[in-house]
Amino acid sequence: VVGCPWQPWC
């Protein structure tokens, strides 16, 4: 996953 646009704890 690049940039993690769906994880609030990137």
Curated annotation (Swiss-Prot):
Coiled coil: none annotated. GO terms for cellular component: extracellular region. One of its GO terms (molecular function) is toxin activity. The modification Cysteine amide is found at C10. The modification 4-hydroxyproline is found at P5. Expressed by the venom duct. Signal peptide: none annotated. Its target is unknown, but this toxin may modulate voltage-activated calcium channels (Cav) or calcium-dependent potassium channels (KCa). Exists in two forms, due to cis-trans isomerization at 4-Cys-hydroxyPro-5. Belongs to the O2 superfamily. Contryphan family. The cysteine framework is C-C. This is Contryphan-Bt. The lineage of its organism: Eukaryota, Metazoa, Spiralia, Lophotrochozoa, Mollusca.
